[in-house]
Design a protein with these regions (language model features):
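Short, acidic/polar N-cap/turn motifs at the starts of alpha helices
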Residues: 54, 80, 203, 207, ...
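C-terminal beta-strand-rich structural cap/linker in extracellular carbohydrate-active enzymes
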Residues: 729-746
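Solvent-exposed beta-hairpin/edge-strand motifs
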Residues: 77-85, 713-728
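Extracytoplasmic
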Residues: 1-188
Length: 746
């Protein structure tokens, strides 16, 4: 006999007693809309572990059970909450396919509304049982890049958000009772931000000018980022660096000094602490400086320095960078782009100084084309030629122009700024719009694909905005809510809010930029960036913001808007290679990754973000797949931290509820090196995905040569959202290669 929905009302004495709730370091309170809730607290001497809620919940003894929590979207924290079943941890703390229950980022995800978060319970813990013992354990947040426990695991220094109710059900799409209180449509009622205004550009100019004057006055060696700031500012009229001879002297002096450091420590080429990700960037910023100031620098190159000409010693730096970069290429898209951009910049500088020692232009341009999916990606160079670790036909972007890492990624997939840097690298310094046209076209394709993943929301102060969708992203750990983003991820270190529009003057990018200006989120984004002025990498991005603003303000109004705008027509965007969909259907928006963090094997899991005017749902759910079975199997290790590796297993005494699960591995193409346990884009990729979630049925055919059949649900009416909302009369629909079908069941 099927179980009905079991509900625990937290803060309600009767309900808590019924579920045998026991707690430590928690408090109950009256929260959103007058509802009771409990939140977990840190200890009196804050440590990384906090309060715990322990309780029992009824389960269905045969079917898949789903656990859901109800949270108030106006609350925020910087804590993490993991769910445990019978003493074992569910999900992973960082980027697991079975996701964690909660991780705050200090933001309020949907102000004035509730949201529901759903995760699946392992069948082997519920089969044959009527109830299970569950725990919600709280922890401090983590810093994802920490390489020691102390750096990685932060102390819990404040309370968690409140948890209002927990539910157990067999439906993957949680349906709240009709009498459950919900918020109102805050998004459509949100006002336009009144401030700040243009005064922030004056503040920006003062901040940049002060930093440049400080750098010019230094009598100690400059780092690469400082050198590039001066060189870049040399052509910016409002800065004290503009056509300032001291800039040229400083650039020459400090590249010479860098060579001295290189002689003392050749490894500095890939480990320079003055530049971010030195093993990616090498001497890219010095190369940019040389290219930018070439007419001012070239007469000094025959001067003798350390027994050789300046031309020769600077060339040695570029050659060393090329040797390292070409043999250390990476396949994650954003990393590939940055590394290949650095290779290209260094080679172009070398072509100016010592063309006979430079690589052919077509070779370094080919690297860029590979990173941008204008040519197949072949990997690093070896003595026998390109390594080809993913075969001869791996493309860094999908046909729909999304990155593959391995599936859809939110923030790491926001690579338009890097494409613009690459486009500018191929341009003649000082000549706008002179970059490679194929690269320009590709960056516009990528920008248009990313626009599908911005949704209407409200910012932290209650004003109208658009946010980036990252809930369904493979490499997005705590990005709910997502950042305020329109076209470009303007608050990122190397980006500016109007970057794509200013670099291309394409009508759609200009329209999206104008939409940001209409909502008065541009000046706020600049003000937010100014908070990081101490980071010279961020300050570097300030240089061109005023000129970009002036350029966009001169453009005629564009009718183009973001596709999820309230006034925009309904539509479905699908990317069959990434296994992701974005659906606008009336007042509802649904994002789903059906190919979800399947790094090692096919996992039959998806991630969903379902947005309605009055509440939101986030869910980690089971789906159906079809694929060619390799016959190989992957057994989940007993990992509880990283969902993809076992080298940070610092949480002694905690064990995974998923350990021992055996998963099938899809067919690996011939010629691709692989063994069970390897992360591989082919190992977990199915040919066909099918998700049933609430009133939606989503079928994705990711294959290039197979057709699958989708059984149409029996219902009063079914409409095909991918075919002009036509009413479906058939019992079965054909899903052709590289197509998606989305049905709405009414």
């Amino acid at each position: 006999m099927a179980m009905g929905k079991d509900v625990l009302i937290l803060g309600n004495k009767s309900s808590e007693q019924k579920h045998d709730l026991r707690d430590s370091l928690t408090e109950k309170y009256i929260g959103g809309m007058g509802e009771t809730a409990r939140r977990m607290l840190p200890g009196t001497n804050p440590d990384w572990q906090g309060g715990i809620l322990r309780f029992k919940m009824k389960v269905d003894s045969e079917k898949q059970n789903y656990f859901t929590v109800r949270c108030w979207g106006s609350e925020s924290d910087n804590a993490m909450v993991m769910l445990f079943i019978e003493g074992k941890q569910l999900g992973y703390r960082h980027l697991g396919d079975y996701d964690l229950l909660h991780r705050g980022n200090g933001g309020t995800p949907c102000q004035g509304r509730f949201y529901y978060y759903t995760v699946p319970l392992p069948l082997n813990y519920t089969r044959g049982k009527k109830e299970v013992n569950l725990e919600m354990r709280s922890y401090g947040n983590t810093w994802d890049y920490g390489d020691t426990f102390e750096k990685y695991q932060k102390k819990m220094e404040g309370p968690t958000i409140g948890f209002y109710k927990v539910y157990m059900d067999v439906q993957p799409c949680f349906l709240p009772d009709k009498n459950e209180k919900q918020g109102k449509d805050e998004v459509s009622l949100a006002p336009v931000r009144p401030a700040p205004g243009i005064e922030v550009l004056n503040q920006l100019k003062e901040t940049v000018s002060a930093r440049i004057n400080h750098i010019l006055a230094k009598d100690t060696p400059l780092g690469q980022q400082e050198v590039w700031l001066l060189a870049d500012a040399y052509s910016v009229k409002w800065t004290p660096a503009f056509q300032n001879p001291k800039v040229v002297d400083a650039v020459i002096r400090n590249i010479d000094h860098y060579y001295t450091k290189y002689l003392e420590k050749p490894a500095i080429i890939s480990s320079d602490p003055s530049v971010y990700n030195g093993d990616w960037m090498t001497t890219c910023l010095l190369a940019r400086s040389i290219r930018s100031l070439w007419s001012e620098l070239q007469d000094s190159l025959e001067v003798s320095v350390n027994g050789a000409t300046r031309r020769d010693i600077w060339s040695q730096l570029m050659i060393a960078s090329l040797d390292y970069g070409t043999t250390h290429r990476r396949h994650y898209t954003n990393q590939s782009m940055i590394i290949d951009m650095a290779i290209y910049e260094c080679n172009r500088a070398l072509m100016l100084m010592n063309p006979r020692k430079a690589l052919p232009e077509y070779q370094t341009l080919r690297y860029l084309y590979e990173s941008l999916a204008l040519a197949p990606w072949l990997g690093k160079e070896t003595p026998d030629g390109p390594e080809r670790p993913l075969g001869d036909h791996y493309w860094q972007l999908t046909d729909k122009a999304l990155t593959k890492e391995l599936g859809f990624v939110g923030y790491y997939g926001e690579v338009v700024d890097w494409l613009i840097h690459i486009y500018r690298a191929t341009a003649i310094p000082g000549v706008p719009f002179s970059g490679d046209l194929k690269i320009k076209d590709q960056l516009l394709r990528v920008a248009n694909a990313r626009y599908n993943f911005r949704y209407p929301a409200i910012d932290e102060e209650g004003y109208k905005c658009f946010r980036a969708e990252a809930v369904v992203g493979w490499r997005d750990g705590n990005h709910y809510p997502g950042d305020v983003i329109y076209g470009d991820r303007g608050t990122a270190w190397d980006a500016t809010p109007l970057m794509a529009a200013a670099a291309t003057l394409d009508q759609r990018t200009v329209g999206v930029a104008q939409q940001m200006l209409e909502d008065n989120q541009f000046f706020y984004a600049v003000a937010e960036k100014l908070k990081d002025a101490g980071n010279i990498r961020v300050l570097q991005s300030y240089l061109h913001i005023p000129d970009e603003y002036e350029l966009i303000m001169k453009q005629t109004p564009s009718e183009e808007k973001l596709p999820m705008s309230v006034s925009a027509p309904d539509y479905v965007f699908s990317d069959e290679e990434d296994g992701v969909v974005a659906i606008k259907n009336g007042s509802e928006i649904l994002y789903a990754s059906l190919y979800w963090r399947a790094r090692n094997a096919v996992n039959n899991l998806a991630k969903v973000h379902y947005i309605t005017p009055t509440f939101e749902r986030l869910a980690n759910v089971h789906i159906e797949t079809e694929f060619e079975d390799s016959g190989m199997r992957y057994t989940r290790p007993d990992w509880v931290n990283l969902g993809f590796a076992g080298w940070r297993e610092w949480y002694k005494g905690i064990h995974s509820a998923h350990a021992g699960e055996v998963l099938p591995i899809a067919r690996i193409p011939e010629g691709v090196k692989f063994k069970p346990g390897d992360e591989n884009i082919y190992a977990g990729k199915a040919d066909y995905y099918e998700l049933k979630y609430g009133n939606y049925v989503i079928a994705i055919n990711g294959s290039t040569d197979k057709t699958f059949e989708l059984s149409v649900p029996k219902a009063k009416a079914v409409f095909n959202l991918t075919d002009h909302k036509k009413k479906v009369e058939e019992d079965v629909l054909k899903v052709s290669p590289r197509t998606t079908v989305v049905l709405e069941v009414r």
